[in-house]
UniProtKB/Swiss-Prot annotation:
It catalyses: a tRNA precursor + 2 CTP + ATP = a tRNA with a 3' CCA end + 3 diphosphate; a tRNA with a 3' CCA end + 2 CTP + ATP = a tRNA with a 3' CCACCA end + 3 diphosphate. Homodimer. This is CCA-adding enzyme. Mg(2+) binds at residues 45, 47. InterPro entries: Bact_CCA-adding_enz_type3_sf (IPR050264), CCA-adding_enz_C (IPR032810), CCA-adding_enz_firmicutes (IPR023068), NT_sf (IPR043519), PolA_pol_head_dom (IPR002646), PolyA_RNA-bd (IPR032828). PANTHER family: CCA TRNA NUCLEOTIDYLTRANSFERASE 1, MITOCHONDRIAL. The keyword Transmembrane does not apply. Belongs to the tRNA nucleotidyltransferase/poly(A) polymerase family. Bacterial CCA-adding enzyme type 3 subfamily. Disulfide bonds: none annotated. CTP binds at residues 32, 35, 116, 159, 162, 165, 168. Keywords: ATP-binding, Magnesium, Metal-binding, Nucleotide-binding, Nucleotidyltransferase, RNA repair, RNA-binding, Transferase, tRNA processing.
Amino acid sequence: MKITNLPEVFTAALPVLKRINEAGYEAYFVGGSVRDLLLNRHIHDVDIATSAYPMEIKQIFKKTIDTGIKHGTVTVLYEGESYEITTFRTESGYQDFRRPDHVTFVQNLSEDLKRRDFTINALAMGVDGNVIDHFDGLGDLDKHLIRAVGKAENRFHEDALRMMRAVRFMSQLQFTLEPETERAISDNHELLSKISVERIRDEFVKMGIAPGSQKAFQIFLDTGLSEEVPGFKGKKDNLALYPQLNFSPTTEANLWALMIILLKLPNEKIPSFMRMWKNSNAMERQVADIVTFFDLVSSRAPSNYDLYQAGLETIASTIDLAHILGQPINGSALVDRYEALPIKNNHDLVIDGHFLLKNGVPAGPRVGLLLEEIKKAVLEGVISNNEAAITEFLSLNN
């Protein structure tokens, strides 16, 4: 197959390949960028593989960075862009089931492509636009298949994270997992426990917020991968609802909120669950806010003060979450009520703590408590948001 109409991300990099070729070496675009080109997907950047050794690349280009030179990768700075260029290589000895103990540079593109994870990622393209396909990646693209290169078990022993990448690609591309590859995941799912939680989390999130997440999540459950991640062991029955949902979460926060709801975790367990997954404090707070507000609107109509405390972002996330779970909720009414609030944050209130101190409220915890009482009164329409009304309120409540 020859591609003649290349997008700018490729044409901008062509001079880099040509310069390597002119120096007497092979160079190709490889991996996900070639796959996404063939699928007409957005391409963020390109990866380049070459027969040239790292020191030879450094001689060809003036500006380089030793990104991972021991493993054959040099970053070339060219025309304001950076390109990762990696020498053809083979790998061996994966004692940690993640990184190779030994890397050997080779001169053969086919040997380099053999170490790739899936056939659709083992494609290469030269400066002439010809696609090189040694493992029927083009056929698997046509069939919408995720298939391991060579023997799947070997690929997963080399890097156990590839099992999560398989279900992630399923979800993102809305492809099917090839049966032998799926069987190899089922047989080796325990290896996932060797991988850092952060890396698993990143793949899980990408899987969970992609359009094909329901089918991918079913494989995630069926193969036993779910048993190897934080907080999911023995919870298959709880999580089995996910593949039956009509919609996927579109944000990371809603994905975690959905997991917490499906797992039936009480609010006090949310922090420990989020920390097990190595989430940030900001994400933990955001998810806790969504779950708390979701529980509230599931049990009663929220007050104006509830809407104020939640904020528009949490309200919108809760509406999306209810939609995903098929729960009836008048989302537009909630948003309209929020937009009509007399104040939406502390700065909207015409007074602050200094005003209270000037009006005879003694310094201490009472100042903060009284501010909240005033906000509630303003939000519920008991008083107007002006100094005169608030002063009168103070005279009656202080």
